[in-house]
Every structure is written in C-alpha cells, then in structure tokens.
Amino acid sequence: MIKNTVEIFIEIPKGDDRRRHLSYDKKQMLDLGPTKNVIPVNNGVMPIAYGFIIGTLQKDESSKNPDEIPDEVDVLLYSKKSFSIGETTKGSPISIIIREDGDHKVVAVDSTTAEIRKWEDIPSAEKELILRYFGYKSPIKKIEGEKEAVEYIEANRVQGKIKK
C-alpha cells in the first residue's frame, strides 16, 4: 500500500538517452540533445524514470539566481513499469538525494514495486548507478528518508497537499 502519494510527470523514461524538459508554459516537450554530452555516466542513458512532482516549485534551487524561473521538484521514480515521455503517474516518496547545488532529487516508488519501501531496499548496483549519474554534475551530500522527502515536497508545494 502506497502511503504518501504524489502526482508525477515523466520527462525522461528509464533507458532514454535524450535530455528533455517540459517548457515553462507547459505546452511542449523540449529536446535538449543527447544526455551523454552533459552526463557521460552510463553513456548518458537514464538509469531510472525522471520527472517532476506536479504542483511544486523548487525554492532552494531558484534562490541562487532570482532571475531564473524555478523548476518543479525533481523526482526519480523506481518502477517495474515502462513509461512514455509526458506520461503522468502516481508515486510514493521513499527518500531524497541531497546535492551540494541544492537541486535535490526525491526518490519515489509506484505500486509495481511493493518490495521497495526505503532507499536501502533498492538493489546495490542500481543505487550505485543512480548516485554516480546524479552525482556527476554536483556532489551528493547525503541521502535522507521518507519523512525528509515528504517535508521537502511540502515545503516546495505550490498547490494541494500530499495524499495520505
């Protein structure tokens, strides 16, 4: 049973090698080119479904440059399901990857992964790849649990609340 549920927009499915971002006006997906040009880890192939939590804006990240439009809270969705670009789904936060640059990544699971309830439950090889991939541009300071992930989402929420 998924406890805290958030709505997730998938920008880059697991296994994809292109950088994509939903435009700020939410009208189109922008293809920003091959990921390996920016993140050569795993030859640029996304090791986990990547997107954002709908109804959030990342306040920590945007405070570095007040002229920049803030991004939504990033989410890495651990799932056995394959997703399409632009698909929305539901997930449950289990942890948060805290990066030095403030661009933290919430880790969530969906109903296909009942055996994964916390970061430590993810197989070691997959965790290591996720950490190398998302730690390439900015060092990872620490990994925190579900409570901290939910608190971070709520602190960056612009509408609604996490469904319990």
Predicted feature descriptions by range:
Residues 1-164:
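Hydrophobic N-terminal alpha-helices or hydrophobic patches in metabolic proteins across all domains
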